[in-house]
Amino acid sequence: LAFQVQADPIQNTDEETKTEEQPGEDDQAVSVSFGDPEGSSLQEESLRDLVCYCRKRGCKRREHMNGTCRKGHLMYTLCCR
């Protein structure tokens, strides 16, 4: 299963900032929603729990490539865990 998304950066909460790796210029955290054309969201638990990043240089350990994402005219790898 692969996805293509258009990404906008999201803000980390203070709790996430303390426990998660900080994204640099090469890594941008994104919010990803999954749904069908009628607009109802997918309820499959494995999709709801995904945390995804748009990365310039490939996925990190414990992440899997799930497609691509675009910010403006730049293409990134969509890495999810």
From Swiss-Prot:
The keyword Signal applies. Paneth cells of the small bowel. Probably contributes to the antimicrobial barrier function of the small bowel mucosa. Keywords: Antibiotic, Antimicrobial, Defensin, Disulfide bond, Secreted, Signal. It comes from the Eukaryota. It is found in: Secreted. The gene is Defa8. PROSITE patterns: DEFENSIN (PS00269). GO terms for cellular component: extracellular space. Residues 1-7 form the signal peptide. Its main location: secreted. Belongs to the alpha-defensin family. The keyword Disulfide bond applies. Residues 1-44 are annotated as: Disordered. GO terms for biological process: defense response to bacterium. Residues 8-46 form a propeptide. This is Alpha-defensin 8. Disulfide bonds join C52-C80, C54-C69, C59-C79.
